[in-house]
Regions:
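Conserved phosphoryl-transfer catalytic core
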Residues: 1-14
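Extracytoplasmic ligand-binding site segments that recognize negatively charged/polar headgroups
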Residues: 16, 20-31
């Protein structure tokens, strides 16, 4: 997996765009059982990421669900990790728009369905969400297009690019 680390370093340095990187990372599972990959994603999320969930975000999502809001998770991260993550928030698998590929008879292919990033996030949302988007939350510059289509936009623990854009647009910025 040294090549994957090197490729990720290229992405972090700006040599590879997010759509390409996330597309490559989801297609590399080609030929594997989706059940096996989903279990591995769940174990990874639970052991490495779940403890980093901001309690205030968990509480906010819970309150929004309780008030009847239609909540979607939109991410360029692979669908398997996002499914595992959304279990912690009570968000249905049918409300996930993430990097994904076609699966045939339980086996992952290398045929991309979507990689929602940048403009692709707002396009993916418009394909499935009817009406106006009340609120959107993002943490990187790849979320700007999605944040721009919401009535209320929130930059949560934003990277410097998004923080600058959020200040310029007078969006709410939150650092936990």
């Amino acid at each position: 997996m040294a090549w994957a680390r090197a490729r990720y370093a290229d992405y972090k340095s700006g040599k590879v765009d997010e759509e390409t990187m996330c597309g490559e990372m989801v297609t590399l599972h080609r030929g594997l059982s989706e059940d096996v990959v989903q279990r591995a994603a769940g174990q990874y999320f639970d052991s490495q990421i779940a403890g980093q969930i901001f309690p205030e975000m968990s509480d906010l999502v819970h309150r929004l669900r309780e008030s009847g809001c239609d909540i979607w998770a939109v991410s360029s991260t692979n669908e398997w990790v996002i499914r595992a993550a959304m279990k912690h928030f009570g968000i249905s698998e049918t409300r996930i728009l993430a990097a994904n590929v076609q699966v045939e008879q339980g086996i992952i292919t290398d045929r991309l369905v979507r990689v929602p990033t940048g403009e692709g996030k707002s396009h993916a949302i418009r394909e499935v969400v009817q009406g106006d988007l009340d609120a959107a939350f993002g943490n990187s510059r790849w979320d700007i297009a999605m944040l721009e289509i919401a009535r209320h936009s929130f930059a949560i623990n934003p990277n410097p690019d998004l923080e600058e854009a959020a200040r310029g647009r007078e969006w709410t910025i939150y650092f936990p």
